[in-house]
Swiss-Prot record:
Keyword Manganese: yes
One Gene Ontology term from the biological process aspect of the record: isopentenyl diphosphate biosynthetic process, methylerythritol 4-phosphate pathway involved in terpenoid biosynthetic process
Pathway listed: Isoprenoid biosynthesis; isopentenyl diphosphate biosynthesis via DXP pathway; isopentenyl diphosphate from 1-deoxy-D-xylulose 5-phosphate: step 1/6
Amino-acid positions noted as binding Mn(2+) in the UniProt annotation, renumbered to this chain: D151, E153, E224
GO molecular function: 1-deoxy-D-xylulose-5-phosphate reductoisomerase activity; manganese ion binding; NADPH binding
Enzyme class: oxidoreductase
Protein residues bound to NADPH: T11, G12, S13, I14, R38, N39, N125, E127, G208
Protein name: 1-deoxy-D-xylulose 5-phosphate reductoisomerase
Disulfide bonds listed in the record: none
Amino acid sequence: MQKRLTLLGSTGSIGDSTLDVVARHPERFAVHALTAHRNGEKLVAQCLRFAPDVAVVGDAETAARVEAQLRAAGSRTQVAYGKQALVDVSKSDGCDTVVAAIVGAAGLAPSLAAARAGKRILLANKEALVMSGAIFMDAVRDHGAILLPVDSEHNAIFQCMPRDAAEHGGIAKIIVTASGGPFRTREPATLASVTPDEACKHPNWVMGRKISVDSATMMNKGLEVIEAHWLFGLPSEHIDVLIHPQSVIHSLVSYRDGSVLAQLGNPDMRTPIAHALAFPERVDAGVAQLDLAQIATLTFEKPDYARFPCLALAIDALEAGGVASAALNAANEIAVDAFLSRRIRFTAIAQTVGAVLDGLSNRTPGGLDDVIEADAAARRAATAFIGKLPAPGVERAA
């Protein structure tokens, strides 16, 4: 039976990869809705190729422009805009599968709406779990939704875990791999001077700018540890991070009997996307087969928490519980945006997040409103902290 998809964040890198897989299997997948923030030109091109029922953008001006171009091309795709429109296409009867690929906190509400509508959710938006893990997982369970991880690491863990939850007691730990990003071997003393372009040059993966910076700080790996905790129900002491520069082993599961299962593949997001789209079947993803003889060498090392303080901050937030993870994510989004805008140094990202967490009044969220309130408070605190920092290249007077 053909699956009907709502693709949240279709113009980003995950969206591109998802549509590439969809195009290879038109007999299996059809598109109900595509969404973008402001990249109207790309969204129009996608709509003309995949003919969704609905296209959603962030604002009225972009919506008017997209609708005019679609009508001129003879397209019948309806155009909507705004946060509620994202929620509407996520819970629509017109789709059975929602690919949640909006970057950041903006993806929380539509992802949660999909869970409450009992959809099959392909989760690439890790912030939904980082911000509101218990609330989100309760919604998945209570409404009979199916949650399939798309992040390469969590998809790898999912593939290596037993399907029967009763057998999860045999797991000793899960090991989340990380490339180490572009600054794995760079002298820590020079990190303050790195540029946004340098931070966005990932050695193995093609990603958007925000997640590329998160990879460079290893905040991305910290967020993935938090996500793994909620997805697989393991405490932080049973989740390890391992640097693996080649990005061939995407993660591992270690069992109590000494067995270790790993998922390997070329670093291409179409592999985990295809796995989740077709699960429990397998389909061609357009990815070349892995040639281990050509790679020849796989190496591993422990993470350097002094070099990557954001990783330590994320693990601390997980262990603190409450709204700490939501505050961590919010502060990081503000700090990364400031870095990409060249308003702060690369090293100030961790400084900002640390300062916000130090000033946090932590509490257990009673519901989504508490999470949203903590997110907003952390954004205000991060913005205030950044406002007191010297601009890059400007030092405070002695």
